[in-house]
């Protein structure tokens, strides 16, 4: 391809700065006031005042928080003890609960829940497998003659 201009190094031989003004203006970070965030409390304060939030100086200063990765965070799907007592009849008809030593065994993870809360009234003796249960829920199920067994959050 044809070159339509001459290189500056070629036609500026002997000029010392090759079109960059005074000596040192085309060197590293000296002409721009330093590298990166240098000087925002000194000679670049006008940039903070112009582009930063008033009062806080964000995004130049201060803590900026932390966004937890979605792979770590758990989406809780709770169910109350009272609602579980209502569901037991339906679950029994569908065959999603089994009987063990005169008590019904319910796995909340298989039902789509991962937390047991203590709202409502429980009168059915149940053995409940769940990753998380509140203190009130454990007490109500124990009072009805059942028990809560804590399992891993990973689906079995």
Curated annotation (Swiss-Prot):
GO BP of this protein: translation
Matches recorded under Gene3D superfamilies: 3.100.10.10, 4.10.990.10
Spans annotated as Disordered: 1-35
InterPro entries: Rbsml_uL15_N, Ribosomal_uL15, Ribosomal_uL15/eL18, Ribosomal_uL15/eL18_sf, Ribosomal_uL15_CS
Cystine pairs: none
Residue spans of biased composition, Basic residues class: 1-16
Keywords: Ribonucleoprotein, Ribosomal protein, RNA-binding, rRNA-binding
Any single Gene Ontology cellular-component annotation: cytosolic large ribosomal subunit
Stated family: Belongs to the universal ribosomal protein uL15 family.
Function text: Binds to the 23S rRNA.
Stated name of the protein: Large ribosomal subunit protein uL15
Lineage: Archaea, Thermoproteota, Thermoprotei, Thermoproteales, Thermoproteaceae
């Amino acid at each position: 391809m044809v070159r339509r201009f001459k290189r500056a190094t070629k036609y500026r031989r002997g000029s010392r700065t090759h079109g960059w003004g005074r000596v040192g203006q085309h060197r590293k970070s000296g002409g721009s006031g330093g590298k990166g965030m240098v000087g925002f409390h000194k000679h670049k304060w006008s940039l903070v005042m112009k582009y930063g939030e008033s009062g806080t100086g964000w995004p130049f200063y201060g803590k900026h928080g932390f966004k937890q990765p979605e792979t770590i965070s758990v989406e809780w799907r709770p169910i109350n003890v009272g609602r579980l007592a209502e569901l037991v009849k339906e679950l029994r008809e569908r065959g999603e609960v089994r009987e063990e030593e005169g008590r019904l065994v319910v796995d909340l993870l298989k039902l789509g829940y991962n937390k047991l809360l203590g709202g409502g009234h429980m009168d059915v003796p149940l053995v409940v497998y769940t990753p998380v249960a509140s203190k009130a829920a454990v007490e109500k199920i124990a009072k009805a003659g059942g028990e809560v067994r804590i399992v891993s959050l990973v689906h079995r």
